[in-house]
């Protein structure tokens, strides 16, 4: 069934600037996976599995491919189309006590609302490089949000 999802959409020309690490980049000496870092929340399946965090935001995909990272529990389920922050996802950042947020769609940009609303220190994967721990200022996050464009995305659910 097709659903209209209200979103804030990342403009194509904005993608390049957000592909640059937005915090401290950690790389393992052998260019393998990085393990054991601490943050308030993790965005991404592999990162969520390999680090100590209070909240996990996952979509069962890594590099756009389905991945099995073991049994997952979901306190909150949100719909978030690729390259967007859905209003549903933004609202989920306000829910206190959730330890696991499962995303139908893509979780990559959800670093933004969780940093803005909760001031979280967030860890996320930097593809083929390592992991980033980010705790940007409220001003930086608001600047990014101002660059997003309101839209409606039709998604088959």
Curated annotation (Swiss-Prot):
Residues reported in the UniProt entry to bind GTP: 40, 59, 61, 107, 128
Keyword flag Amino-acid biosynthesis: no
GO MF annotations, alphabetized: GTP binding; kinase activity
Pathway(s) served: Cofactor biosynthesis; coenzyme A biosynthesis
Top EC class for this record: transferase
Biological process according to GO: coenzyme A biosynthetic process
EC number: 2.7.1.237
Record bears the keyword Magnesium: no
Keywords, ordered alphabetically: Coenzyme A biosynthesis, GTP-binding, Kinase, Nucleotide-binding, Transferase
Pfam families: DUF359
Reaction(s) the record says it catalyses: 3'-dephospho-CoA + GTP = GDP + CoA + H(+)
Signal peptide: none
Function summary: Catalyzes the GTP-dependent phosphorylation of the 3'-hydroxyl group of dephosphocoenzyme A to form coenzyme A (CoA).
Family: Belongs to the GTP-dependent DPCK family.
PANTHER family in the record: GTP-DEPENDENT DEPHOSPHO-COA KINASE, UPF0218 PROTEIN TK1697
UniProt name for this protein: GTP-dependent dephospho-CoA kinase
Organism: Desulfurococcus amylolyticus (strain DSM 18924 / JCM 16383 / VKM B-2413 / 1221n)
Top-level taxonomy: Archaea, Thermoproteota, Thermoprotei, Desulfurococcales, Desulfurococcaceae
